[in-house]
Amino acid sequence: MKPTSSAAARNELASDKAAALALTPVSRETERRLDRYIALLLEWQAKTNLVAPSTLPHLWTRHISDSLQLLDLAPEASFWVDLGSGGGFPGVVLACALAERPGAKVHLVERIAKKAAFLREAIRVTGSPGTVHLSEIGDIVEKWSGRVDCVTARALAPLHQLVGFAEPLVKKGAKALFLKGQDVDAELTESTKYWKIEPKLHSSRTGGQGWIVAIDCIERRS
């Protein structure tokens, strides 16, 4: 879907937006920020592959709602770290939603410069409380010294790798929320070979075969 998409495509996206906001309601102010974010994403998508092209007609239900649902699993969390933010899901979406919470902050970690540039522009355009870190994940989490309530990742890596990335932050008191797909059981089995974890599984509100893996404690197996 290009910025000059047809009326039919625009109508399809509008219908998808309505379905998403019924699923994960937001304030009028947050909706306006998300509108600006989606417009920017569609503009950049023409030159930078930020999301799978096949998902463009369903940006709101497939990506926005999928991201927003994390807030219900950590309602008191104000300081978030999103690993491998890419096109901004869930990091930018969370920042848009948390803009009305005084003092809230979302840190977006991205190692690819072009995507980090997009994320910075998205934070600027939406006026959301976010900071973009152009860095390898391992480099930044090991040195993290600030407060973190929740660490997230979506479409980034197998679960056992995500657990390893998140370990330093979880040991500082963060809760990990990872968006995973239909292979979650196999990924959990693989993860227990390397880590002692007590994950809680939440089915995705967006349907399909999506899951959210919540982890509060991580210990490396010897």
Curated annotation (Swiss-Prot):
Q: Specify which residues bind S-adenosyl-L-methionine according to the UniProt entry for this protein.
A: G84, F89, V141, E142, R154
Principal location: cytoplasm
* Reaction(s) the record says it catalyses: guanosine(527) in 16S rRNA + S-adenosyl-L-methionine = N(7)-methylguanosine(527) in 16S rRNA + S-adenosyl-L-homocysteine
The protein's matches in Pfam families, at most eight in alphabetical order, are given as: GidB
Top EC group: transferase
Q: Does the keyword Transferase apply?
A: yes
* Location relative to the cell: Cytoplasm
Q: Which domain of life is it from?
A: Bacteria
A single GO molecular function, which one? rRNA (guanine-N7-)-methyltransferase activity
What Enzyme Commission number(s) appear in the record?
A: 2.1.1.170
Summarize the protein's role: Specifically methylates the N7 position of guanine in position 527 of 16S rRNA.
This protein's name: Ribosomal RNA small subunit methyltransferase G
Q: Which organism is it from?
A: Bradyrhizobium sp. (strain ORS 278)
